[in-house]
Amino acid sequence: MAGGRNYGGSTDLTSAGSLASGADDIISGLTKFENTEEYEVDFILMGSAKYDKETSQGIAQKCIAVAEERKDAVAFISPYRAAFLSDNQVGTVTVNDIDTITNNVLGFYAPLSSTTYGVFDSGYKYMYDRFNDTFRYVPLNGDIAGTCARTDIQQFPWFSPAGTSRGSILNAVKLAYNPGRKQRDALYSNRINPVIFSPGAGITLFGDKTGLGKASAFDRVNV
């Protein structure tokens, strides 16, 4: 780009943050997927949850609204990053304690709409980013959608994507949050699917609920 010019003809080119998108941009983009005639999608991923709690809830709610409008797709939601991790200015990350994380996750999902078109997961995985040669924490919504896609392809859509045979999470070194039985009970009773690590089984999806807030024939992903 040396010697180049911007659209105004000036040479004061800047690139920092040029590809960054705000929550308004994401929500605006998601609106396009309400058009079922032009866009064919099965899974709507929340993607990055780097924003604060309220902003992340807004993006999650939009994903759900789009899936509800389409009625032929499912939204996959992860909590906001700060529910699990404390980032400091020197580039290191501290993982919050298990009780704080549990309360944060429950608080994040509590106001989200009850829906059969959404799937809520419990967190973040630690993985190797081969493009930047570093390890980083990423939200699990893409992985949960992946277990559903894999199950659709290798078995049938009405099979559960959870468990040790079909719910394996790939490319994961560890979890930011590995809920025990007490935490899993609290999460699952609040329509949140735990992702856990267990010796011998690795990291797996341990639940197959939809985001429906009441018992129903439609409160499971595989129905």
Q: What are the residue ranges of the model-derived segments?
A:
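A glycine- and small-residue-enriched flexible loop/hinge signal that marks low-structured segments
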Residues: 1-223
